[in-house]
Design a protein with these regions (language model features):
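Charge-rich, well-structured scaffold segments of protease-associated domains
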Residues: 45, 49-169
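His/Glu-rich zincin catalytic helix
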Residues: 1-54, 165-169
Length: 169
């Protein structure tokens, strides 16, 4: 129907947010600590596919928009659009469940996320929010930034990403 204005909104959420930087990895028995910002970094890297269309290209060609976001407790991948619901859902499931991390693409992402951190540091509202949060949650995992610090980001490797992915996804 030409007058149908239905817009589909589909999400894929995993319970891996920024507060989960200490955990027992899958098939291991000892607690491990990873740098802050890993969940957000992983969110960025899941958008990179080994071959074929990248998510932004695929969804754009089908008339949909895609995005992702990380919170303290979750990471969500999503798309919205009026057409091709089945194909879009299948693609969302495929790209989120087929990670592709290399030392090269992890290193290049560090620069992108570092720029994101600097943008937040240049925004007075973000700076105030970070200050209030750090002081309000002094002894709580919510005190740490979702995106991490530049020091945290520089410690992230493809092995850390795969370990977190395999544990939480």
């Amino acid at each position: 129907n030409k007058n149908d204005s239905t817009n589909n909104y589909v999400t894929f959420t995993t319970k891996f947010g920024s507060i989960y930087n200490e955990f027992v990895p899958l098939e291991e028995f000892k607690m491990k600590k990873v740098p802050h910002g890993v969940a957000h970094f992983l969110e960025h890297k899941v958008f990179v596919q080994k071959e074929g269309l990248q998510p932004e290209e695929f969804f754009s060609k089908s008339g949909a928009l895609c995005n992702a976001y990380t919170t303290f407790k979750n990471t969500t991948y999503l798309f919205s659009g009026p057409n091709n619901l089945k194909e879009n859902i299948l693609y969302l499931l495929d790209y989120v469940q087929e990670p592709y991390f290399t030392e090269e693409n992890v290193e290049s992402e560090k620069g992108i996320i570092t720029q994101e951190i600097h943008m937040c540091d240049d925004n007075p509202t973000d700076v105030l929010y970070e200050y209030i949060r750090k002081n309000s949650f002094y002894n709580n995992p919510f005190k740490d930034s979702i995106i991490g610090t530049t020091n945290d980001i520089n410690k992230i490797t493809k092995d850390i990403l795969y370990e977190c992915y395999n544990t939480f996804y």
